[in-house]
Amino acid sequence: VPKPLIGQTASEFLRLYPSANILVATERDFEKSRRKQFVSRIATGDYDCIIMSHSQFEKIPISAERKERMLNEQIDEISYAIDEMKERNGERWTVKQMESQKKKLEEQLKSLSDESRKDDLITFEELGVDSIMVDEAHNFKNLAIFSKMNNVSGISSSGAKKSTDMQLKCQYLSEINDGRGIVFATGTPISNTMCEMYVMQLYLQKAALEEMGIYHFDSWAANFGEVTTALELTVEGSGFRFKSRFNKFTNLPELMNIFREVADVQTADMLDLDVPALRGGKPIIV
């Protein structure tokens, strides 16, 4: 949960489950000198629930073997896309952005063998955790996306470290629970780009996508998205330019049917939220 909500979450959990054995992480528990002891308590204890902040959760390492496997999968994904483009456009065709991404991943893979564990902690896989619930899960939407689409807004190849860490831990839990064991709670699963829908599905139903033959973003985009090009004002405001954006859904009913296999969608109307009336009764153009 977000750091300010740890105490409230613990109180609510005990109110609902008064006989539960819970462990609540404090700021001191994750100080460098005490972190190893606290993580050992998780591994050796018999807890119904362990509550900690997003930043504390990230400090529990995932195994180097799992990181290596993910990097190899990403390198293979980019290599396949590059080969496909060269086959279509000729051997001299180069994709600088994707070649650069591949090189960075290979460097990460090379340095991984020399990377020591954070504080020599027990890894996440060794804790005995069998499920996870992430509050405000939209904080982990910034995953790196590898695509052969060039110069298209709405597709980011850079990702946040905490999102990659969450992805690896979710993959592990999905493997040991046959695709279950992960709960994301958020009011904004999609807020900035269409790619966020793909990211949510990657976290929660990766196996379902693969059963449909969707193993990477470009395959998902070909089924459920469309790139549109429009004339836009330049940043300087001195002229116009054509800009391509990945911003239009296709096959939306089919996509929502798939997503609803893992999503319990609640709209404002369904929740009957008490929203105050607008002053003046209508929006004001500023």
Regions found by a protein language model. Name each.
Residues 1-16, 22, 29, 34, ...:
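Conserved Walker A/P-loop ATP-binding site and its immediately adjacent core
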Residues 87-91:
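Short, Lys/Glu-rich amphipathic helical modules
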Residues 29-32, 157-164:
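Conserved phosphate-coordination/catalytic loops
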